[in-house]
Design a protein with these regions (language model features):
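Short alpha-helical DNA-recognition segment
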Residues: 18-36
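DNA major-groove recognition helix of helix-turn-helix
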Residues: 29, 38, 48, 67
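DNA major-groove recognition helix of helix-turn-helix/homeodomain DNA-binding modules
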Residues: 47-63
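Short, charged recognition helix plus adjacent turn
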Residues: 65-102
Length: 102
């Protein structure tokens, strides 16, 4: 599944579960744009993802994670979290070894 379509489905699911209509997003975007995103016709910027997440009172990563769960329905949330945790733990341990700038 294409990322645009998966992200659109994740956005629609998160929006619907919160009982929000596309029109409710008028403060952050047009209904037309939301519709295009949900159908996979457009790709939002990271800034727009953050605006949507703030409006829905969720973390922006929730929308991104939802996208990848939509894209790979055989992958469960726990295994995805474990992969992300491993990636971030590795990066954090590497950054501790780097000298700090003054």
């Amino acid at each position: 599944m294409e990322l645009n379509i998966a992200l659109g489905r994740a956005l629609r699911n998160l929006r619907s579960r919160r009982g929000l209509s596309q029109d409710a997003f008028a403060l952050v975007s047009s209904r037309t744009y939301i519709s295009q995103l949900e159908r996979g016709l457009k790709s939002p910027t990271i800034e727009k993802i953050e605006q949507f997440a703030t409006f829905m009172n969720i973390h922006p990563a929730s929308l991104i994670i939802g996208c990848y769960l939509e894209r790979s329905p055989d992958e469960d949330l726990q295994s995805l979290f474990e992969k992300v945790r491993t990636d971030l733990d590795f990066d954090l341990s590497m950054s501790k070894d780097e000298p700090t700038e003054k």
